[in-house]
Amino acid sequence: KAVFFCAARMSKFFPLQKAAQFFLLLIRGTPLMLQLICVYFIPGLLWGFSFDRFVAAIIAMSVNYAAYFAEIYRGGFESVPQGQREAAKVLGYSKAQAFVFVIVPQVIKRIMPAMGNEVITLVKDTALVTVIGVVELLHVAKSASNRVFSTVPLFVAGLFYLIMNGLVTFVFACVEKKLSYYK
């Protein structure tokens, strides 16, 4: 989805570019919690059917994060100097070859830190799905905490989030290190 939104946003076709720009503004400009509520409740109000809670959560979070990733990708593509494309052309690369072998590797290297941040935020934002009734880690910890009159389950949940995000950080650090071939 993010690649499609990025391509639409960078399109030379003005109506498509403006539609993508508006859609990305709409998604990035509204809270994820509101998007979760809308995806779960609005189809039932308008058309008489509703998504399963888990499916609604996946749809809302996928679209939300696709919008953020699309802007990260766009920034990555726009950060590659025009001279790189010209150099690839001089070397005899076709546009497709230049894109695959010259542009994309530079984009991936440049967007890794921002992508890592978004994935960490995604892990933490999973706690928001409880607003539409999806049972997730923090909800279970809160219920357990209320049952046993202790904050220990909440600290355990926090520790789990910390471990998950530590793993995400480690993986992205390894990828970044692998991509920093000039150091």
What are the functions of these language-model segments?
Residues K1-K183:
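Transmembrane alpha-helices and adjacent helix-loop boundaries
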